[in-house]
Amino acid sequence: MRNMAKIGQFIYPWGNGHYSRMMRLNERLKELGDNEFHYFSKGDIYQKLLDKFPDEKQNIHEVLMPTPIDGKFGPSLAKSLWNFLLPVEGNEPLVTQISSYLKDEGKLYNKIGFDLVINDGDMGSNVLAERRNITSLFVTNQFKPKLWKSRIYFKPALEFVAKQISKASKILVADSEPPYTMCEYNLNFTKDIQEKVVYVGHFTNEKKIEKGEKGDLEKFTDE
């Protein structure tokens, strides 16, 4: 009799893209057989998980992953930079947040004992998995994206992020293989990790749409 694998899904809580991708992947994983799934996030995404899986609440865990501080039109660069070492708008310094969340996440790693972890946006989980010799998959469509000269000061941060992503056992790119890659401008993999990279296509809903009566636009274009 096959033992159930324990699979952890770590979903970065900033925006809905990470959640949407992981839920599509989760559907496919559940088609492969009975396994024990655990979900990790915070805030609105954590609540969405509770609403989506009411019978699995014991396997849904809130982890306070650090996120950028919001501004009027997306993340506030100035506030996020200040927050690296200083408290801003009720947020502890980022270095404190990272240390605290990795400790909490590490305790859950030790308690659950994963066979596989899948991380969409949560780079810290890559580090924890590597230390414990657990297979980890990192889902992304960005790796060392090219920068305009006016944004070159972001380069050290991108190098740090790339280093953490590289700790995954495999890097799953949510895009088509070259030369049909849509986000190629954002993908600049170094030679030393090319063997880890797998293009898995777009995480889209493949449900068929029933063909109904032609709409006004279709009738117009057919004329």
List where the protein language model places each region.
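Extreme N-terminal starter segment of soluble prokaryotic enzymes
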Residues: R2-I7
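A short, glycine/small-residue-rich beta-strand->loop->alpha-helix junction that serves as a flexible
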Residues: F10-M23
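An aromatic- and histidine-rich active-site surface loop
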Residues: Q47-K48, V117-R132
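Conserved nucleotide-sugar donor-binding subdomain of glycosyltransferases
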Residues: L77-N119, M123
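A nucleotide-sugar donor-handling region in carbohydrate enzymes
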Residues: E159-E223
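Nucleotide-sugar donor phosphate/pyrophosphate-binding loop at the beta->alpha transition
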Residues: K146-A162
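Conserved nucleotide-sugar phosphate-binding/catalytic loop shared by glycosyltransferases and other
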Residues: P13, R28-T96
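Active-site proximal beta-strand in glycosyltransferases
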Residues: L116, E130-L147
